[in-house]
Design a protein with these regions (language model features):
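Active-site-proximal substrate-binding groove within the catalytic cores of carbohydrate-active enzymes
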Residues: 3-175
Length: 175
């Protein structure tokens, strides 16, 4: 809130938030953030809805997963919720490319009540309809990518339409 008697700069708020996140981490608590800024990422245990591109720049013709390269094995991260994504296959493949965990958004009650509401984007979140498929998808994903989640990402290259991500243990993931 704006308070004309007590101004707080963005820089001061940044430092306050960074201090609080550091305190939480130092106390042994897990810290989950959504997207997050650079100062928050270093204190996080999990980053959800991470932008794998690290921002869009019109002068760059090719995508380089800078944030995943910098953070992999140091912080766990996910992309968008697969069951709510416009293109779930694209999110799944990009997640595999950058060694991300999978994220889903679920409701315990029927999502039909959301159909004509301002929360209609959660219509695909009905756990009773998707939980079995999600369980199978997560098991397959974990099996396919076992051994990379705790490994530093050491390389990322594009060969034609295929990306190759290399990890410290020598594992290569082709997408």
């Amino acid at each position: 809130d704006y308070d004309s008697k007590n101004h707080t700069t963005r820089e001061a708020v940044l430092h306050q938030q960074a201090e609080k996140l550091a305190e939480l981490k130092a106390s042994g608590r897990d810290v989950m953030i959504r997207q997050g800024n650079d100062y928050a990422a270093v204190q996080a245990t999990l980053i959800t809805d991470m932008d794998f591109d690290g921002g869009q720049y019109s002068i760059i013709d090719e995508y380089v997963p800078f944030y995943p390269l910098a953070l992999h094995s140091r912080v766990s991260y996910t992309g968008a919720s697969l069951n709510l994504a416009d293109d779930a296959e694209e999110v799944l493949l990009r997640s595999a490319e950058v060694g991300a965990g999978l994220q889903y958004t679920l409701t315990a009650q029927s999502a039909r009540v959301l159909q004509d509401s301002t929360y209609s984007e959660f219509y695909g979140a009905d756990a009773s309809l998707v939980l079995d498929d999600i369980t199978a998808q997560v098991a397959q994903y974990r099996q396919a990518l076992s051994g990379i989640f705790n490994q530093e990402m050491t390389g990322h290259e594009r060969v034609g339409n295929v990306t190759i991500t290399t990890y410290a243990n020598g594992t290569r993931v082709y997408v």
